[in-house]
Amino acid sequence: MTFIFNYKGKNFTEEEIVQRINAGISTESEKSIRLLIMNLSNTQLNILKPLLPDIQEICDCLFLQKYMATITLTNLLFETMVKLTLVYNEANGRTLDDGYEFENIYEKELNKYGKKNLGENIETLYKKNIITSEEHDRLIYLKNSFRNPYSHGSNNKYVESATTKLYESHLGSNEIKENIATVTGNPYLLLDARRTFIRQYGLGYFAEIVNYITTLDKDLRKLYHK
């Protein structure tokens, strides 16, 4: 299974991401991955600007190679992106000039979509023609592969099918036997497989979510042009 992550029109394969992460973000010879994170850190938003501090914090985690923290925050960013897009879309260009108070200008919409789960809100994005059918399917895929398992402590299908090598030997014998084992029956193997998956794909997932954010922000600006 090959993952392809899209960031600002450029596709990053899993091989590229794995190679760069394994080389180490902090090494001087590895410039491209650092530039990608810096580029993400410098994301410019207008309508979805409240998301910028979260984007910056995730970038900080990536520089420190804190991948499990990265996935947790990216899942929160994903869900908040969807909710805020629905909030601003439904508000339809509302500003303080329309007679609303600063502290409750979007109160109705925040209460409405804040109570719904991610899957429901993605469906609403599609029904409102805010996203295409392809984008809908991709967001559902990201929800099932990243958000659900890493927010609920469950496993995605890739971790479920993961295997690892175990080596067996006996006292008095020079023979070492290699065994291929599944990971789901032992907590140490299972959690290590989860961490390995995120080390390999967490950056690509984050970059793709930021790409969606910038695209949605651009579309929302059409409603808030005044």
Placement of each model-derived feature along the sequence:
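Charged alpha-helical initiation segments
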Residues: M1-M68
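Intrinsic-disorder-associated interaction segments
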Residues: N6-S29, Q44, G99, E103, ...
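Charge-enriched, short contiguous segments at helix-coil
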Residues: N129-K226
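...with weaker cross-activation on analogous glycine-rich loops/strands in unrelated enzymes
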Residues: K115-S133
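Amphipathic alpha-helical interface elements
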Residues: N39-N117, E134-D137
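Intrinsically disordered, low-complexity sequence elements enriched in Ser/Thr/Gly/Pro
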Residues: V18, Y113-G114, Y141, S145
